[in-house]
């Protein structure tokens, strides 16, 4: 009997071990599947941002070799008006990401095309409101005391910025629309081809045609609109048969709720874009301003490249959360959040360690000055900590965007960045004389507080309740498929007629 009992015990133990191995294998497969889904979104999204940033850098490089005044005018226009407007438009496009992601998860595919058309209407309207600011950029800069010659050059080049502004409306919204339905490869391919076209077109316009700064901006417009046109062809040409059923009068319904969500989205993201610009502006008033600005700009450049990875991961977090909320699976939402946070934390630790390891050596890629190198090395610790925080914070923002919490994130950004980060930086620089390290420490404090608040909010979020809210939003905003089809102008239907 004792022998039989021992055998039974052994079989139970073996069965338990087998069950544990099965559960472990299932978990590994589940994690790997989630990681693959995440990178399918994050890689093309990152590539899009890197290539878009590259097109702006190409224009600046060609302008710099053509005219010092032109370079100063372009840099001033880029760092103030274009960056300001781009931040708002990029933020507003995240509303498209939220709605399309949730609609895709809920299998309300026909609504994705409607949401895309509504975003075109709303974003084009907002972009048009900014046109007078671009037209009056020169007088505004002169009013602010900027150099007259540079501001007059801005008067010459502003017309080239207006078509670029409208290209952003379409490229950003269509990117979010395609990204929400996992059609990511086309985004990366078009972005890469656009950069190649941008280099070729800018070289031709500047070096061959002798158009100078105007040629550089023409090249930028050619590349940006080529992406928009290619995306139009992809969407209209039948590659999105379930989500694009043609133009519809339903696009003009529920524009006010769409406008509210878009504005809160734009406000949320633009606060992050402006934060670094304000910090750089403040560095110009620090002791040894030339060294301070140079060192700060180098650190900002490193920080900006890392931000491209961050925003790619943010897009992945947003789409995955929105998709699973649309499906009504709260457990899958939690699992997606855990996976993307772990992956981003690993990337953050690696980038942070590289920054610490190479410290001042990084500066020699941009400057031969020993003083600048020492200043960058002095900032390397706070820069590495910033990178670590910065890789986590966008993920949390992406989760919030996927759930439609843009207004909450905007308030958190406003409080942590502008009520804490900027004032603390000013205090450390001008009262305690900590120099640019104090300025960056103030910025780091703002990012750190924002990260902690978002961590708490995401941790306390009732995802079952968010699923219910998503279902209610889908019911409120979703049109019945037959009704949509009756108001749809389909090119293929017209051809058959």
Swiss-Prot record:
It is a multi-pass membrane protein. GO terms for cellular component: membrane. GO terms for biological process: xenobiotic detoxification by transmembrane export across the plasma membrane. Keywords: Membrane, Transmembrane, Transmembrane helix, Transport. It is found in: Membrane. GO terms for molecular function: antiporter activity; xenobiotic transmembrane transporter activity. The chain crosses the membrane at residues 43-63, 70-90, 121-141, 157-177, 186-206, 216-236, 261-281, 291-311, 339-359, 381-401, 416-436, 438-458. The keyword Coiled coil does not apply. This is Protein DETOXIFICATION 25. It comes from Arabidopsis thaliana. The lineage of its organism: Eukaryota, Viridiplantae, Streptophyta, Embryophyta, Tracheophyta. The gene is DTX25.
